[in-house]
């Protein structure tokens, strides 16, 4: 029974195999029948069907446009769009269905009707032969340019001046074609300044001229706080002409948009002072006798053959602490003030209070000292905390003090007392012509040199005067490394 069943099953499987082979053979022999369907092109649609606006109700040239597409036998792989020019080479590809565009206005016109056309592309590369189109009625807005008051020159500057300004366009910063600056000449003096639309419309440049002689000069432009040389599209340095040394100058800025609309001009004036010396005299004496005291110092410098450039920085008075940096300095410290002070080899700084501009000296003179400059500071000391910022700059370790619980009230040097040199045997011995009250003795910081000392005395609550011996320094020279600073008090 089992043998007969096995034989039967084998015969059936053989027959099934023959039938399958026959069917496959017949299929290959017969081929596929039916009608071939061609790929159908996609269709494209604008989200907005039409726009009806005239006159002042026209749209800004910066517009967000959206569209969509459909493909009956596949899917939309992307789109191509064109603005005004719809010739075959003018289309741009995108996979987006919306974007923000700056629609171009014909140069010289204030209004225009701009054509925007878009067409879908399907997965087989077929393009919508018709596409979708819409004309946008737009009106151009005038751009603007304005100086930033905190980034313009002080009333009087030497050879370096900085200018910061902002530009804007209601149609978007991408619609700005250029921003320009001119000096004293608004007909032929305009110079393009490079800008990036990503900097929120803020620009900052510095202009340096050779101010060793008076007259009209050409200046070089530097960009940003990094003070990097500005170059044009051909790699040449950007120069500006018309700046006059020894005269009041006017700087102008303006902005031009893609349609050629020009902003109103903004302007700022400043005086460019000639630099005649390698020595700069900084007058930071805030009291009424400022000019008389300055002339006293200048007379002694003149005896040494020194005729310095003079910079008055004595505006403002300390109140509840240190004074703000003088408004007679540039408003921008870095790079303007630092670069300016570095133009001299030596600085002679006179002040009547350690809470005046000298507290800013460590910051503003960094490039001056980095270039090998030296400084002489004469300033009366007073009782200040050892944590005061002045000790970060002056080569002073400490100033005169009285032990707690004592009866001493102040310092005095009597008339006729000698001020004797310590470091240089050829230095003259000085003598006070009158009694001096309020001079504080000094202790030199490590690495500096005590130049002069004197016999300080102490006044007391009981009315008598005693000798003061803790320290007796009058002036100190800092010679530790480069640069060095020199101070007399």
Predicted regions: what they are:
Residues 69, 120-122, 255:
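Conserved structural position at the C-terminal beta-strand
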Residues 349, 353-452:
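A glycine-rich, often tryptophan-bearing local segment used as a flexible ligand/cofactor-contacting loop or short
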């Amino acid at each position: 029974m089992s043998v007969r069943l096995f034989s039967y099953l084998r015969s059936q499987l053989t027959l099934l195999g023959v039938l399958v082979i026959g069917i496959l053979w017949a299929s290959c022999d017969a081929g596929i029948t039916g009608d071939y369907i061609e790929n159908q092109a996609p269709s494209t649609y604008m989200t907005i069907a039409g726009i009806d606006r005239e006159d002042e109700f026209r749209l800004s040239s910066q517009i967000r446009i959206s569209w969509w597409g459909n493909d009956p036998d596949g899917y939309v792989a992307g789109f191509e769009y064109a603005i005004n020019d719809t010739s075959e080479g003018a289309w741009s590809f995108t996979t987006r269905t919306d974007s923000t565009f700056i629609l171009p206005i014909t140069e010289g016109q204030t209004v225009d009707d701009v054509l925007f056309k878009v067409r879908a592309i399907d997965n087989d590369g077929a393009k919508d032969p018709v596409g979708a189109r819409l004309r946008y009625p737009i009106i151009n807005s005038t751009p603007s340019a304005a100086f930033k008051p905190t980034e313009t020159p002080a009333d009087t500057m030497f050879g370096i001046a900085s200018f910061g300004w902002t530009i804007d366009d209601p149609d978007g910063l991408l619609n700005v074609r250029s921003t320009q600056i001119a000096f004293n000449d608004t007909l032929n003096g305009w110079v393009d300044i490079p800008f990036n639309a990503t900097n929120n419309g803020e620009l900052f440049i510095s202009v340096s001229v050779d101010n060793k002689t008076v007259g009209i000069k050409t200046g070089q432009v530097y960009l940003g706080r990094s003070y990097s040389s500005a170059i044009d599209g051909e790699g040449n340095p950007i120069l500006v002409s018309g700046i006059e040394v020894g005269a009041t100058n006017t700087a102008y800025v303006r902005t031009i948009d893609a349609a050629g609309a020009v902003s109103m001009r903004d302007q700022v004036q400043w005086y460019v002072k000639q630099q005649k010396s390698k020595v700069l005299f900084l007058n930071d004496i805030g009291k009424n006798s400022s000019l008389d005291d300055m002339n006293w110092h200048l007379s002694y410098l003149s005896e040494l053959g020194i005729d310095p450039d003079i910079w008055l920085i004595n505006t403002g008075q300390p109140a509840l602490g240190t004074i703000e940096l003088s408004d007679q300095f540039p408003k921008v410290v870095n790079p303007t003030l630092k670069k300016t002070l570095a133009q001299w080899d030596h600085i002679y700084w006179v002040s009547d209070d350690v809470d005046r501009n000298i507290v800013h000296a460590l910051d503003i003179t960094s490039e001056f000292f980095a270039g090998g400059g030296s400084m002489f500071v004469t300033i009366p000391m007073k009782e200040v905390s050892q944590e005061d910022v002045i000790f970060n700059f002056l080569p002073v370790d400490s100033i005169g003090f009285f032990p707690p619980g004592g009866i001493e009230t102040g310092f005095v040097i009597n008339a006729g007392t000698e001020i004797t040199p310590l470091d240089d045997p050829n230095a003259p011995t000085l003598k006070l012509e009158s009694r001096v009250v309020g001079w504080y003795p000094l202790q030199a910081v490590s690495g500096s040199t005590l130049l002069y000392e004197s016999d300080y005395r102490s006044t007391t609550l009981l009315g008598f005067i005693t000798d003061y011996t803790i320290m007796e320094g009058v002036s100190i020279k800092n010679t530790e490394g480069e640069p060095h600073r020199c101070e007399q008090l």
